[in-house]
Amino acid sequence: MALVPYRRAALSAKERQHRRRLLSMTFITCLVLVMIGSTIHVVMLGRVRLGDMRNLATYDLAEESSRVRAAGEDLVLHRSHEEGRAANAGYAVVEAQQLLSREQWQDLDSMVRIPAGEFVMGTNLERADPQDKPEHKVALPTYYLDKYLVTNAQYARFVAATRRRPPSTWKDGRIPQGELMSPVTMVTWNDAADYAAWIGKRLPGEAELEKAGRGTDGRRWPWGNKMDPARLNTYYNVGSPNNVMAYPQGASIYGVFDLSGNVAEWTADELLPYNGATESPIAQGASGRNFKVLRGGSWKGDPLSTSLYHRDYAFPSHATDFYGFRCASNVDRVVRAQN
């Protein structure tokens, strides 16, 4: 008996549409069930995690005294470990002194005499920032200013002698390869002020930095009134702080290096408006802390920020890779040191 093959009747267009609708609904239902299951799983995990955290965060009051003692012991141990790590890292005093030759130390530690007299401070240029205005005259007595920015090598002597925490860019408390003669950075205003006091000097006032660069003719940059990228390190033309002796062609008429560019310099002064200013700069942060003035612009800044009249500012607790400093002194201290 011959078998007759079964042939399924062709579905009508209406039946095909109905089946597609059923398949779509089935897929959506499965997807929703999966999402619901995942959500329940996450919620359960969250409840378990919150329970663990609650157990860790709470304890019986009867145990409080023992826990307080344990916390105190932890603080003592942490402080001890920090001191031990500081003692085992970085430079010893003798080692820091041997980073450079005697001649190099003498050159780096040299100061330049800035004679007494009047100079032009600030500017009336329309495009200048409000805190830079107005132009006015200031008279200063004779003072001395570091010829160079304070270098990593010089700061290493301070760190070694005082066991101060080194800049965060120093790996294991040591200066990165090839940066002995670069200006120290990642230092706060307080770090800079403490270094200056340790070395027997002080931070310069912003007027002292400006006069050392502008001289008596009110120039915009240490070499004159025309911007010249070959005379300073700014606007990423080097890409990092560089040797403090790299730009003799950018020195001021008194012989001070890097008053424009390389790193912005902390000053002793708070940011306050000049007398006669029509607009007041932001002189205080939201927390009531005052800003400190920085001068000179940096390797990261635009060329206009290196204008000698420009006033930058930051909180004294702030540190970055384009802030540094130099020191100043009065005449009497320097004369005594030379005798």
Residue ranges and their predicted role:
Residues M25, V32, S101-S168, V187-N190, ...:
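A short glycine-rich, aromatic-capped structural motif
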Residues D109, E135, T142, Y254, ...:
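Structural motif
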Residues V68-Q106:
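N-terminal low-complexity, Pro/Thr/Ser-rich intrinsically disordered segments
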Residues H136-K137, D146, I253-G255, P316:
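Short, surface-exposed beta-strand/loop micro-motifs that present aromatic residues
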Residues A10, I114, V120, N124, ...:
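Functional-site microenvironments in short loops/helix caps that host divalent-cation chemistry
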Residues V93-L100, E135-H136, P241-Y247, Y309-D312, ...:
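Short glycine/threonine/proline-enriched tight-turn/helix- or strand-capping micro-motif at secondary-structure
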Residues A2-A62, A71, H78, A89, ...:
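Disulfide-stabilized, aromatic/cysteine-rich ligand-recognition loop
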Residues T151, A268, S329-N330:
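Extracellular, beta-strand-rich glycan-interacting domains
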